């Protein structure tokens, strides 16, 4: 069943029309849902407590905030990168 659906989607793609393929890919993608203020606040509090989550803690945070574990994992990855960037900018500013 799943395989037949995948074949149907492939049939919709037209190698001679990359723009149509791009539009099709964009329309089938999951809509971006920003986090609520409450979710962001709770994720930030958790991040201040610990920059890295165990699998069990990630499951708990996701359950409490009504997010997927993947969303929590990626939020933490992005937050660590943001912190790394902020620290780099701070040290660059201090050195100049």
Swiss-Prot record:
Q: What are the protein's UniProt keywords?
A: Developmental protein, DNA-binding, Homeobox, Nucleus, Transcription, Transcription regulation
**GO CC field:** nucleus
Molecular function GO terms recorded: DNA-binding transcription factor activity, RNA polymerase II-specific; RNA polymerase II cis-regulatory region sequence-specific DNA binding
Q: Does the keyword Methyltransferase apply?
A: no
Q: Which Pfam families match?
A: Homeodomain
Signal in keyword set:
no
A single Gene Ontology biological process assigned to it is: anterior/posterior pattern specification
The DNA-binding region ranges are 28-87
Task: Give the subcellular location.
Answer: Nucleus
What PROSITE patterns does the entry give? HOMEOBOX_1 (PS00027), HOMEOBOX_2 (PS50071)
What this protein is reported to do is described as:
Sequence-specific transcription factor which is part of a developmental regulatory system that provides cells with specific positional identities on the anterior-posterior axis.
Similarity-based family: Belongs to the Abd-B homeobox family.
Self-association or partners: how does it assemble?
A: Interacts with Geminin/GMNN, which inhibits transcriptional activity.
**Listed name of the protein:** Homeobox protein Hox-C9
Organism of origin is: Ovis aries (Sheep)
Gene (UniProt): HOXC9
């Amino acid at each position: 069943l799943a395989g037949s659906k995948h074949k149907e989607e492939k049939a919709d793609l037209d190698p001679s029309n990359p723009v149509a393929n791009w539009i099709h890919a964009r329309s089938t993608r999951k809509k971006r849902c920003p986090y609520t203020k409450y979710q962001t606040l709770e994720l930030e509090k958790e991040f201040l407590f610990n920059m890295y989550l165990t699998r069990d803690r990630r499951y708990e945070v996701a359950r409490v905030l009504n997010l997927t574990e993947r969303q929590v994992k990626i939020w933490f990855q992005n937050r660590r990168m943001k912190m790394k960037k902020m620290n780099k900018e701070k040290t660059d500013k201090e050195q100049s």
